[in-house]
Amino acid sequence: MLELRLVQGSLLKKVLESIKDLVNDANFDCSATGFSLQAMDSSHVALVALLLRSEGFEHYRCDRNISMGMNLANMAKMLKCAGNDDIITLKADDGSDTVTFMFESPTQDKIADFEMKLMDIDSEHLGIPEAEYHAIVRMPSAEFSRICKDLSSIGDTVVISVTKEGVKFSTRGDIGTANIVCRQNTTVDKPEEATVIEMNEPVSLTFALRYLNSFTKATPLSNTVTISLSSELPVVVEYKIAEMGYIRFYLAPKIEEDEEETKP
């Protein structure tokens, strides 16, 4: 038997909105410690890892480990029926091929039940190795989102370079080039508005902007975003979910073929 009750129901809605365009079908894994998901996008370029720890739920019962295959677009449609202030409860009986979503209004005067069929999804669980990153940038999530959006009106890819001067986002396209530099800024009154750069060695990597723009759909979940970079490793774009866990997006860097050819 599985029963999860989340008072902050809007949180689950935001999680689904942030991943439903990237991943079509995925398994939600429930264990005694939490509710998690790990899935690749359809083109196998990006990976998303979600964790909601059990202690973040008002009530969390998971008698045995269970994996629930769901179509994320359908799940998002169901969650759209919940009000932003609603309490959301997820229920699944052992061996059942359905999951029930229950939405309760805060005043308890309206309760809605939605039942959704589960799917059988074959998915290999990818071990994500713990890595030491050359550079870690923490910045306001809204600022990162704006940068990705602005640069995609110029080009398709972004070069993210971290030096001791700051972090630089650059792109080039048919109409010209654009460079945006964010310097370390820790003197702000509110910690969530700070830009903090930890760098062991300079790093410069190229990424597809359409994926980064997709990742920024998680902006409503957190005021800050952490970007971890290392040569030849996927970038990790992490949004912490208040007191509960995180959503992490991994994206492999693009190898610049043109540059490879012009090297002596």
From Swiss-Prot:
Protein keywords: DNA replication, DNA-binding, Nucleus
GO biological process, one term: translesion synthesis
PROSITE patterns reported for this sequence: PCNA_1, PCNA_2
GO cellular component, one term: PCNA complex
Segments forming a coiled coil: none
DNA-binding annotation, residue ranges on this chain: 61-80
Protein localization: Nucleus
Function per UniProt: This protein is an auxiliary protein of DNA polymerase delta and is involved in the control of eukaryotic DNA replication by increasing the polymerase's processibility during elongation of the leading strand.
Protein name from the UniProt record: Proliferating cell nuclear antigen
